Amino acid sequence: MSLQSIKYSRGSLEILDQLLLPGQSKYVVVRGVEDGWKVINKMQVRGAPAIAIVGCLSLAVEINPEDFENKKSLRQEIEGKLNYLVSARPTAVNMKIAADELITLANELYKDEAIDVTQMKHRFLDATEAMLKKDIADNRAIGANGAQAILQGVAKAGKAPAGSTGSVRVLTHCNTGSLATAGYGTALGVVRQLAELGKLEHVYCTETRPYNQGARLTAYELVHEKFPATLVLDSMVAALLRAKNVAAVVVGADRVASNGDTANKIGTYQIAVVAKHHDVPFYVAAPLTSIDLAIPGGDHIIIEERPDREMTHVGEHRIAAPGINCWNPAFDVTPASLITGIITERGVFKPAELKEAITKLLES
């Protein structure tokens, strides 16, 4: 059974505090929007899909017990609080897209004279809760599509390890599993699907400095699932791809531009460069909500920068010389030219065909 990072029932929300993993499993109560903003900003919850789900559910928890005088006050509350939640971590587009969808819904309900303020509130709560269920279903579809793409690519290239009966070795970066989503995972969902098919020989995960999401979170999930797995340092990727016959790299995404350029956890770009050099397919696994058609290319993506302390300290222990300057971008942008395919719940697309394909899907 996969880990549960989000516990929700109407009026109640708890999140697994990922800052304490793997040493301690502790759930934090989120009582409203201010709590939601804080757990997102402090990275107690992280991963673009999970950020969106927790942000929206924090608003649902806050407004659930409230009685609003009229529909206008409810609409204003929804719009103001959702826009505030977007500011917690601006690089992840999922929260912005979810906020825009819910604000649009609130405006439609406000204009609908057939429903009163109580009905409007419950319709809004229903829509917010539906996002939780949809994320899990989408992740399972991403897993199935990604596993199929990798296995077909391996069969075509003849790259399966000798004696592996078609099983594959894959590399992943950061954390994209149940801890980063409502459940199952995106890139780690692809790994999970390979395992369910009996086609996973081995998975390698990077430590993912400086926050160590790979070492703390992905390794934690892989051990929990009893997958054959090995942790490697970020600086070992080139040697790994040269020595271990890795069939594919699969990573997640915080934002994908319309041309396929992808913002993901810092270190993704260099892995893609190394994969290209070693002729290893490089896949991005992300729901449609991570694709921002309004952004033409990666140069337009805002990159969040994190505090120096995340680089200079591990816990309370300083590991860097006092007085040293630090540059700590949380994400980098991988050019579309380095990406083999973008795995979504609706199929796998080459970056060059992404904008047209997604536009057609959204119109259908």
Swiss-Prot record:
Record key words, sorted: Amino-acid biosynthesis, Cytoplasm, Isomerase, Methionine biosynthesis, Nucleus
One GO term of the biological process aspect: L-methionine salvage from methylthioadenosine
Pfam family, one: IF-2B
UniProt key word Signal: no
One GO CC term, this protein: nucleus
Sections of the chain in a coiled coil: none
Catalysed reactions, semicolon-separated: 5-(methylsulfanyl)-alpha-D-ribose 1-phosphate = 5-(methylsulfanyl)-D-ribulose 1-phosphate
Cellular localisation: Cytoplasm; Nucleus
Enzyme Commission designation: 5.3.1.23
Gene3D superfamilies in alphabetical order: translation initiation factor eif-2b, domain 1, Translation initiation factor eif-2b, domain 2
Active site: 254 (proton donor)
Site note Transition state stabilizer, residues: 174
Predominant subcellular localization, coarse grouping: cytoplasm
Top enzyme category: isomerase
Family annotation (SUPFAM superfamilies): NagB/RpiA/CoA transferase-like
Keyword Isomerase set for record: yes
Molecular functions (GO terms): S-methyl-5-thioribose-1-phosphate isomerase activity
Biochemical pathway: Amino-acid biosynthesis; L-methionine biosynthesis via salvage pathway; L-methionine from S-methyl-5-thio-alpha-D-ribose 1-phosphate: step 1/6
Alphabetized HAMAP family for the sequence: Salvage_MtnA (MF_01678)
Family classification: Belongs to the eIF-2B alpha/beta/delta subunits family. MtnA subfamily.
Function: Catalyzes the interconversion of methylthioribose-1-phosphate (MTR-1-P) into methylthioribulose-1-phosphate (MTRu-1-P).
Protein name: Methylthioribose-1-phosphate isomerase
